[in-house]
């Protein structure tokens, strides 16, 4: 297990410092599996761990890299104590539906944090040449340079879902000469700026720092989502969302997309006191968390409790009832 110091991620956007907990700390150490360290989940997890660790001493939280698709199974089987994921993956993991091969019924929701949007960055020059949708990417007769993001993440899963729906695969696209990279958001941001890639995808909240940086170094725009792809994503648990105009250079108007709701999961074996204290401490330090990511500025107990039909952890139920977020 690789644990990352929360403060490193908060300060630098991505974390490289690695600490291995000693045996004496193992009982007290709890891990949060995030997404890529510089992405939305990474920053949310790092901020949460940081304020929690500073305001109590019974449990210490650390963050570890993961992915929205992989984290439910990882948490369920003890690979991490908590994990960020998305509502569609949490539901399908509990039920044992694709992309999961078996059910993970011990998963419990702690809190919903945000609604993410599927960001499809593309070089403006490539967009103007006629590659404006996923359909254009799949049917292209010339090799393309595409960043598909780390395998196991919700972003990579979304891309694979679309490609298969269009009758292709990453392997078929690679066979025509495509350059494909499966790297994190920070690396993809740098690569699209320098022209090493022309397409970069990311399920994230707004604003997203990697996307902002990418647009500062190259003229970028967003691919269009066809009605065909919107129907596909709707059938797989995604909901309509809007990427606000004015956040990313060169994109003054709102962009219609599809997205997922990001949430924190644990299992039914997790201490109710730990879950309760995480939520209570987080809300008590919401101004501090708001400086880590703007998502926290809009994060309320009512929003956190809105996990749909997913089962809430008893510690979360206790907190949400106490503050009047649920009955």
Kindly label every feature range from the protein language model.
Residues 101-119, 247-256:
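A structural signal for short loop-to-beta-strand junctions that line the ligand-binding cleft
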